[in-house]
Amino acid sequence: MSQGFIEFPNIDPVLIELGPISVRWYGLMYLVGFMFALWLANRRADQPDSGWTREQVSDLLFAGFLGVVLGGRIGYVLFYNFGLFIDDPLYLFKVWTGGMSFHGGLLGVITAMLWYAKKNGRTFFGVADMIAPLVPFGLGMGRMGNFMNSELWGRVTDVPWAIVFPNGGPLPRHPSQLYEMALEGIVLFFILNWFIKKPRPLGSVSGLFLAGYGTFRFLVEYVREPDAQLGLFGGFISMGQILSLPMVIIGVLMMVWAYKRGHYKDELPQQTK
């Protein structure tokens, strides 16, 4: 290889093996993301007049977690491997083969939030604005897990920080997982948690999340290797970009609608404490 490129560090994707049970770095990253979200949600619930209790945010995050797992798997199969699913419907349940989709997970979380809001007498946007700032850190941890698994790497490049991934061929590639970790995880986290400290109407936080994530993901897709089974649609746009563009549009429209509507207080159930 040409000098100046970085060889992928020798990282064993398995952290610990306990008999037949393997604890993987990828799973640990998601666990860290979930625990951080729970800690942050509890801090927000403890604030005066938050309208939330620790028990309520725990129930919400548990519902959201189920939505992420179920929606992420179903979305991956339908968006990225639909042909394989048609040939083998049981592929949907073969989770050990890997495969999760953020956009599918998002739809799963939206479904979970709709259910939670209806069950607990809350507004959907009140629930969505609560959970949106908790998500980016977990996304960042997930991208770190992708990097440690040497998967979802970027396109071939000659930038000085390019990395030769063990299962990405002999040529150096963009570490697109780290780009996504930085943008979707760190930058979006600070943007949202700065924004919620200001007076803002209901729906604006979740709208900003959709617009922010969609923008960052759309941009990174230009240096991320397209899925081998799909390639580029029309030779210029990836499935990730097709799914992210509506997020940007919907997110911007939500923010415009939220500010025009001007509702700054959520309608809370009678007893929240």
Curated annotation (Swiss-Prot):
It is a multi-pass membrane protein. It is found in: Cell inner membrane. It is an enzyme of class 2 (transferase). Pathway: Protein modification; lipoprotein biosynthesis (diacylglyceryl transfer). One of its GO terms (cellular component) is plasma membrane. Its EC number is 2.5.1.145. Belongs to the Lgt family. NCBIfam families: lgt. Catalyzes the transfer of the diacylglyceryl group from phosphatidylglycerol to the sulfhydryl group of the N-terminal cysteine of a prolipoprotein, the first step in the formation of mature lipoproteins. This is Phosphatidylglycerol--prolipoprotein diacylglyceryl transferase. It comes from Vibrio atlanticus (strain LGP32).
